[in-house]
Amino acid sequence: MDALEQARAEIDAVDTQLAALFERRMAAVLQVAEYKRAHGLPIYDAARETAVLEKAAARIQSPALRPYYKNHVQNLMDVAKQYEAVVLGQNRAAYQGVEGAFAHIALRALFPHAEAVSYPTWDEVFDAVERGDAARGVVPFENSHAGDVSAVLDLCYNHPALWVVDVYDLPISQNLLVLPGTKLDQIKSVYSHQQAIAQSETFLRQFGLPATAMANTAMAAKFVAESGDASKAAIASVETAALYGLEVLVPSINTDGDNTTRFIVLSREKPTGGNRFSLLFTVDNKPGKLGEVIQIIGASGFNMESIKSRPMPHVPFEYYFYVELVGDPTADETAALLRELDRTCRTVRLLGVYTK
């Protein structure tokens, strides 16, 4: 046996021991979950996690290995929280629309074992997560062709109790769906979500097809299927066609071949780590104040990947701002940046922490 085989054999032996220890650990996690159920305690305990990570770092003698072990322990705690959520019946994820909607597809990719719960509007998804009716919410945030989903950003601003804990980029292929046997020249009206209509505007204009906006693409497909009217068509996914018994008459009608929608994941639990973080802030309506904030961010060494502005609710002609920054949200530099922004901005809030 050469050196490589010996090393791999040692890894296999250690992995066998780790598997038994993992089962032992998860049995203890089950006891913790049952105690939390009996005493009405939340799954996430920030103070406990901080203490566990500090003890974990102290166990490792090698400074080079210490951060890797801390990441390993953090992953173990994340798995434990997921297991506790299942045990406590909190394995529910909310989305807007009906089965087959792009949000439902994104949810299934993110949480394949979760109980998917549908709500009619984005507002109700936010409310469900905030109330604790769902542990997570999956909503669209922006599209590479049609731009921001402004209403969702406004909901983030208006729900300070919620965090963005993950993002997911879903490649979007918009398709013209019809009743079986329908020809293109029979179609008189098209139904879909406003974003899908915007993403398919070149095709619609080419064939002179008027479009009507609906709550989402899957609802449009369901409407066309239930109408039984061959003059109606929907713009939606291939998965939706199969779900509602429709045919794909024209595939990939979106103008942008690289059409992608970014979804965000909402949670009541504060995220612990990642390589991106996002902020919401407001500034005094004075010359140069926004520029001052941008200069502070730049001077702190953070790359700004996105900046957006939106009108402030009930405050005419004033705006709040959203920025996404590249960096470790737990680093000392991030804490220093937030302190500096707190002194400069009228308000500032850490909205999200995630890996991208």
Positions of the model-derived regions?
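Domain-level signature for soluble enzymes in the chorismate/prephenate branch of the shikimate pathway
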Residues: M1-K356
